[in-house]
Amino acid sequence: GIPNRKLILIGEAPGYYEDQKGEPFVGKAGQLLDKIFASVGLSRQKDVYICNTLKCRPPDNRDPLPDEKAACREYLDAQIEILKPKIILLCGRVAVNSLLGTTQGITKIRGKWFEGPNMSKMMPIFHPSYLLRNDSREKGSPKWLMWQDIQEIKRVYSQMD
């Protein structure tokens, strides 16, 4: 993404396809993410800067180790400092744990606003790969909850200069 975005999304780490292309969220999860943003008139090309907590993929797609998160944290903090976003979306458990320092399950804290760096607002959201594994759109399902969250994100985004 290009700097000077009011909205950034922080994911976990590059996956296989992201490693190949050198861009975050380019596989099926990224395609779903693009559709989610498009549903409220946002696009990755002009509205959203996307990055990851980790800058390289852990072997065998395992959870990152604490020292791996720590090694990348300075770089992530620098990205946030340079971009000075108004809204930071924490996409998935690893991003939530890294930036909020909580081990609470994302289902309990998704959709809630937290104070972020530089007077920003942070919101944990479901990772699109989780949504791909949970296909139901019934009220209360992960996809239904994500729809509620993206509408709240758009509402707050629209109120910012």
Region roles according to the model:
Residues G1-D161:
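A polyanion-binding, active-site-adjacent surface
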